[in-house]
Structures are given as C-alpha cells and as structure tokens.
Swiss-Prot record:
Protein name (database record): Photosystem II reaction center protein T
Homology family: Belongs to the PsbT family.
Organism field: Pinus thunbergii (Japanese black pine)
Domain of life: Eukaryota
Chain segments annotated as transmembrane: 3-23
InterPro entries linked: PSII_PsbT, PSII_PsbT_sf
Chloroplast listed as a keyword: yes
Length: 35
C-alpha cells in the first residue's frame, strides 16, 4: 500500500513540475490543431 502512495506522490510532483515549466514558457513542440 505504501508503494501506491509513493507512486502517487511521485507522479503528482512530476505533473506539477511539468505544468509549471509548460505554462512558464511557450510550448516549442508543434501542436496539431492547437490554439
């Protein structure tokens, strides 16, 4: 059960960091049908 909690914390932390970097600077990846 602890493994599930640690995995959730790890994924949530990576998600927050990813979104922080993604929204801080404009995405350089070519988006299909993006805004």
């Amino acid at each position: 059960m602890e493994a599930l909690v640690y995995t959730f914390l790890l994924v949530s932390t990576l998600g927050i960091i990813f979104f922080a970097i993604f929204f801080r600077e404009p995405p350089k990846l070519p988006t299909k049908g993006g805004k």
